[in-house]
Amino acid sequence: MPVQTIASKRVAHSRRGAVAVEFAITAPIFFLFLLAAFEFGWLNVVRHTADNAAYEAARTVMVPGASAAEATAKATSVLNVIGARGAKINITPSNITNSTTEVTVAIDIPMSSNGLITPRFTGKTTLHSESTLKTERAN
């Protein structure tokens, strides 16, 4: 059995509690990065869903006989999959006729009301998605 010297006992004794102090310093920083990663991951989910909603709404309204209300309903349906709140959907032109050559669907989603954990990381960011398609009724 090895014999401990007085110097080695002092070193072992002076390190007591060091792990707890190091954990207390590093854990909040680690969890802050972890929460930020979740929040920015969610921001990407919302952004991609908004892109998809704008595209799907434009596809819905590009066919003859479709209306802006149908495009709004389609975009809302896609955004409801993730529970997006406060989205503003704008269809241009608002009155779609047989002479309409292209349609644009724009969606704005405020991240302040759509944060996963806390809106502190995204602040007043507003995600903007837009899709423009030629209509099938154009000559």
Question: Which residues make up each language-model segment?
Answer:
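Short, conserved structural patches
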Residues: 2-5, 59-139
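Alpha-helical assembly-interface signal, strongest on the long, hydrophobic N-terminal helix that forms
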Residues: 2-76
